[in-house]
Amino acid sequence: MFKKLIDKHKKYVYHRINKMALFATIGLLGVGLVYSAKNLYTHQDNQVSIKKSFYLNKKEVRQKLIHEIDVPRILPRLKSEEEKQAESRKKYLNATITYLTEENKKAAKHTKTKKVQKTNTKRNLDKAVSKSTNAKAVKSHEVVATAYTAFCSTGCTGKTRTGYDVSNTSYYNGKRIIAVDPEVIPLYSLVQVSYEGNSFQAYAIDTGGDIKNNRIDILMDSEQEANAFGRKNVRVSW
């Protein structure tokens, strides 16, 4: 009997527990559904606000672009061909025309005559200078030429009257050396010596006791060359 009571009580407790678990499960499901619905509505509100903000910004951007397009831009206007031709005709018609009067003609003639006279004067001066130069260039003398060496039995020192050492050479700046009478041919003159179809240039940088008037002495490298030259009539130009 006690066993039956206990079994009956167990069945009652078991059914009671199952019923409570069922109610608890239903309650939890209801709470979950309510919470999910609330989150869904909140998410939809956020989506609507984002879309609204986006479309508002898009509208503002469109209005800004339309405003910029509507602003007039001032560009330089290009002139047409007719306007350019009209300006050219206007400049041509407004140009100042200068007529030659008698006074202007006289002034122009006077200026031209003065310029011609000045040019002719310059040409005459150039010709005079050229003639003077040519006259100096063709100055020449017929002289008697002999030859000498740097060392001789009468006490030659190996130097010219101007102090140039000729102990090892008979040339000065690539030209021959001659002794002259400074009263006839100035010292340091570059002269042209011509004789018997021969011609050479020489510097007059030496003098001699016997070299007077129309006499010159040509420096040679050796006594043999000096003796071979001997005595000749030559023309000296400077």
From Swiss-Prot:
Signal peptide positions on this chain: 1-37
A Pfam family this chain is assigned to: 3D
GO terms, biological process: peptidoglycan turnover
UniProt region (Disordered), positions on chain: 111-132
Top-level taxonomic group: Bacteria
InterPro entries per UniProt: 3D_dom, Resuscitation_pf_RpfB, RlpA-like_sf
Entry keywords, A to Z: Signal
Bias kind Basic residues: ranges: 111-121
Gene Ontology cellular component annotations, sorted alphabetically: outer membrane
Protein biosynthesis listed as a keyword: no
GO molecular function, one term: hydrolase activity, hydrolyzing O-glycosyl compounds
Protein name as catalogued: SPbeta prophage-derived uncharacterized protein YorM
Source organism per UniProt: Bacillus subtilis (strain 168)
Highest classification ranks of the organism: Bacteria, Bacillati, Bacillota, Bacilli, Bacillales
